[in-house]
């Protein structure tokens, strides 16, 4: 079942930000429902969006990426919209273990989550099709297994 979106007609650029914030809150909530204490990081332009406590004294830096399409991006630093100066060089970068420990991809259409360790994305390009990420879909055991590493 697809979720209802923007029935009030918020301007598309503004709604994009609202939707991104919603995906972050959904991701944090899903971690908590899975049994992992999790908190959103409210620092503008931080490289990660949340911290999750996976047990054994381990905290992970989590980048939450929402998607309503068929793929997920593993990059940060890029923004779009009228407010962006296109004359400035791109600041887009691919996340690494220096930035984050985990990508938590949230399907914006239904809330499905993909739990992807950053080590795994290092082997891939900047994007990957959700259909090729089935092993990560709703696989919360990945967080449990990271606690024992």
Segment roles from a protein language model:
Residues 1-46, 51-149:
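Mixed-charge (Asp/Glu-Lys/Arg
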